[in-house]
A protein has these predicted regions:
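Membrane-interface interhelical connector segments
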Residues: 36-49, 140, 168-186
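Extended, low-polarity transmembrane helix blocks
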Residues: 1-38, 54-66, 70-168, 187-193, ...
């Protein structure tokens, strides 16, 4: 009996493909950070005023690795998700938010903010899924369906600068489009417009499930069509590896947020949720 109870406490728990991918990416980020001793792309740029940069880089890598592993185990999943949410929200507020007011160009600063916000939103969704009754009593909206809605809005707002960057940095966008696709500028404009439309839809809760799913598909296709061939073609430098992993991190984060709409009609204008933050028709 005791052995069975112990086994139950350590069993793996994966609630969705997005959850599994997000955990895997966090582990990957941790391994990269610990092996290099530097901030991987998901944490960059880091302001020059930050002290003890090397120690902080190792701390970020350790949090990523330990929390990624923790997300896969039933007993530790809630704690792991809470640690990721807390660390990413601190990073968002301390390292990203101030830059919106004095750094330029604004769209690139907002892009960095959005990348961190996507991952924070995904971790927040996972935390609500795994949170127990005690967490809901103690933390209120952070651990209930209101927290999921905040996470979804974070994701929606993040998509808007992703789209704007396609228009403002057209040349940098078109060089990433595979040569076998015709009209690269057209694809750049199209994907930029769809990011903006999806961001507005998710933010305002209009056709949000469809918008979240399609934006996840778009980010995932970018990972597969743009980066996988580059990995297969030859060795990447550290920056390119970082960009490759960040793209998969955004794919994983988007997938988790899209999963939070499960059960909602695809064309629903408004969303209701159960006590665990999962959408319900």
């Amino acid at each position: 009996m005791a052995a069975s109870a112990a086994a139950a406490n350590v069993k793996i728990r994966i609630v969705s493909p997005g959850h599994a991918l997000f955990a895997a990416v966090m582990i990957w980020l941790g391994v990269m950070g610990l092996s290099k001793g530097t901030f991987v792309q998901v944490w960059q740029p880091v302001p020059k005023w930050v002290p003890a940069r090397e120690a902080l880089a190792y701390l970020c890598a350790f949090i990523s690795l330990a929390s990624g592993i923790g997300l896969l185990w039933q007993r530790s999943a809630a704690v792991a998700a809470r640690v990721i949410v807390a660390s990413l929200m601190v990073w968002l507020l301390v390292m990203r938010l101030p830059n919106l007011f004095y750094e330029t160009p604004l769209v690139l600063v907002a892009w960095s903010f959005g990348s961190t916000a996507v991952m924070a939103g995904a971790a927040w969704v996972l935390y609500v899924w795994f949170a127990g009754d005690r967490d809901r009593r103690r933390l209120g909206f952070v651990a209930d369906e209101r927290g999921v809605r905040v996470a979804q809005v974070l994701y929606g707002l993040s998509l808007i600068p992703f789209g704007l960057a396609h228009f403002m940095y057209l040349d940098a966008t078109t060089v990433l489009i595979p040569h076998w696709l015709p009209w690269p500028a057209g694809w750049a404009y199209f994907t930029g417009a769809t990011f903006i439309a999806a961001g507005l839809a998710v933010t305002f809760g209009l056709f949000a499930r469809l918008a979240a799913a399609l934006s996840t598909l778009q980010i995932g296709l970018f990972s597969v069509i743009v980066w996988v061939p580059r990995v297969l073609a030859g060795p990447l430098n550290d920056f390119q590896w970082g960009e490759f992993v960040v793209t998969w991190a955004l794919t994983a984060g988007a997938w988790v947020v899209a999963d939070s709409y499960r059960g909602t009609p695809w064309l629903a204008g408004r969303v209701t949720r159960d006590s665990e933050g999962r959408s319900a028709a």
